[in-house]
Amino acid sequence: MVKPTLVTNRIRALRFAHDEMTQADLAERVGVTRQTVIAIEQERYSPSLEMAFQIARVFGVPLDDVFAYPGDTIPDEGAAS
């Protein structure tokens, strides 16, 4: 069994807010496999800092709108407009 990461994210919500972008579309834009995107979304894998910035750039939002660490708060889904 894979241990979940402490990093949480809003990738799925952001994908749906961006014309229902697929995991494959995001993976292609970031340069990783769809399986990597799935693992990050399910919080089974923490992306590198570089990959985290690339993901945030795809959505046009700051890094902390996508990822949070314990003690941080992730903005509500409606806040990233």
Language-model features and meaning:
Residues E50-D65:
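DNA major-groove recognition helix of helix-turn-helix/homeodomain DNA-binding modules
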Residues G31-S46:
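Recognition helix of helix-turn-helix/homeodomain-like DNA-binding domains
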Residues R15, E41, P70:
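DNA major-groove recognition helix of helix-turn-helix
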Residues R12, I38-A39, F67:
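Key DNA-contacting residues within the recognition helix of helix-turn-helix
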Residues M1, R57, F67-S81:
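Short, charged recognition helix plus adjacent turn
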Residues R10-R29:
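Short basic helix-loop element that most often maps to the first helix and adjoining turn
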